[in-house]
Amino acid sequence: MFASWTPTCYINLGPAYLIDLAHTRYTVQASQDVLLLRNTTVTSHKFGPDNLFTLKFYPGGLEAVLGINQVQFTDRLLPLTQVLPVALLAQLKQPHTFAERVALVEQFLVRAFRRSAHPDHYVRLVHDAIGEYQASGLQLNTSLVAERLFLTSKTINRYFHRVIGTSPSQYFALLRVRTALTAFVADPPAFAPSDYGYYDRSHFAKAVRHVTGQPLPAAKR
């Protein structure tokens, strides 16, 4: 998996496994639940059939719902108990169905969100900026996104570093690659690089290699 800046919780319902975070390898025991920011490439290695229940937050989502800023988690593998209550994790490890686990998580997150006083100003503007970029068909540059939100380029850059941990230009480029690569994998013959702001197939392939480290035919989402 390549970078997405989406805080992701891995609740382990099965055996131990290995996980590579950039150039560091960790062993996650059967009893361990972990959190990754996914600001870099992540590779997992299973010893057998894996059984992971995952929960992924939108960039800035941890802060919007739980009041926890994600920037502190950059390049780290953390115990999930730093984010979710031990009691909730114990419930999720019981022999429930997938739908029952989803319901448990939803109940907890909805209660946590309702306890939040007001949406953070920084988080709201970053989400608005991402929405503007997506609404433009991934075509706008950072300056134009900032202009639509009545912000300066310097201000929007500061907000992205504060909420996500990277610059808006880097995040938008990553979002564009992920979106385009999803479309390419789904239907390669119908894929048109220009639909995603790339000049041609070569330009797209170069972006994919830069983000994934793999040539286009072998790249995975």
How should each PLM-predicted stretch be described?
Residues 120-122, 132, 160-184, 207-221:
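Alpha-helical DNA-contacting segments of helix-turn-helix folds
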Residues 156:
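Nucleotide/phosphate-binding loop and acidic/charged catalytic motifs
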Residues 1-127, 133-143, 148-153, 166-167, ...:
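Alpha-helical bundle regulatory/interaction domains
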